[in-house]
């Protein structure tokens, strides 16, 4: 009964966001046979127009559909949850597309990655498989096993070489058990990636500026 009561309390507070004065959060909770362990990961990269609405006050005056958008707040944790002596780097749903989601977790000693996701709104489209492909990329980039667990999309284990194991069909109940290896190494990507981002962004800006200058010089008067 105590576990059921705790589950109900956490569900109301963290999932429904109904606790007075508490923000809405998309949170992954660590739950064991002893109940909620008080450890969670709050999604840091929340989805615009779904989990939150940019320029909400303005858009609400324009469209009645604005009320359907969520009002979630992003988290600021390191993305690591301790699980049975391991350290899981958690990226919720499409949070895995952001470079820093896995990199930051690895910097905080994550030795495998978990991607819990819903996918219900994707239907039978290829978005589920796009997310799975991005998870493959992260597995190779960071040299970590990735476990994708979906409520309705494709679940799978992905080894550090990008191989997909035990992939499940869409909208079918399955379970799978597999032993995975834990890694502590850091790849070159974990160190170089932030600098490469800055370099290519700077180059892109310079190319745009150069194109504008060149266009103005070559502009033919009408």
Per-region residue spans from a language model:
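Short, solvent-exposed loop/turn segments at conserved positions within beta-propeller repeat blades
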Residues: 21-24
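A short loop-to-beta-strand structural motif that recurs across blades of beta-propeller domains
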Residues: 27-29
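Short, acidic, Ser/Thr-enriched surface-loop or helix-capping motifs
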Residues: 31-33, 158-159
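C-terminal beta-strand edge segments of enzyme domains
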Residues: 53, 138-221
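Flexible, solvent-exposed short loops/turns enriched in glycine
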Residues: 46-66, 121
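Single conserved hydrophobic/aromatic residue that forms the stacking wall/gate
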Residues: 1-11
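Active-site beta-loop-alpha substructure in enzyme catalytic cores
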Residues: 62-136
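Generic structural signal for well-ordered beta-strand positions
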Residues: 37-39, 165-166
């Amino acid at each position: 009964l105590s576990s059921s009561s705790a589950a109900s309390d956490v569900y109301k507070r963290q999932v429904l966001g109904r606790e007075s004065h508490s923000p809405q959060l998309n949170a992954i909770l660590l739950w064991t046979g002893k109940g909620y362990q008080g450890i969670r990961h709050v999604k840091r990269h929340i989805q615009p127009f779904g989990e939150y609405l940019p320029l909400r006050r303005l858009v609400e005056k324009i469209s009645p559909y604005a009320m359907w958008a969520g009002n979630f707040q992003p988290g600021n944790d390191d993305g690591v949850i301790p699980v049975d002596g391991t350290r899981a780097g958690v990226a919720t749903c499409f949070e895995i597309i952001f470079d820093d989601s896995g990199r930051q977790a690895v910097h905080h000693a994550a030795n495998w990655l978990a991607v819990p996701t819903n996918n219900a709104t994707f239907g039978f489209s290829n978005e589920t498989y796009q997310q799975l492909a991005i998870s493959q990329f992260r597995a190779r980039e960071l040299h970590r096993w990735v476990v994708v667990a979906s409520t309705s999309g494709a679940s799978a284990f992905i080894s550090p070489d990008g191989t997909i194991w035990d992939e499940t069909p869409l909208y079918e109940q399955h379970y799978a058990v597999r032993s995975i290896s834990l890694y502590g190494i850091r790849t070159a990507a974990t160190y170089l990636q932030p600098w490469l981002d800055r370099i290519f962004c700077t180059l892109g800006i310079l190319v745009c500026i150069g194109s504008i200058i060149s266009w103005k010089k070559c502009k033919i008067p009408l």
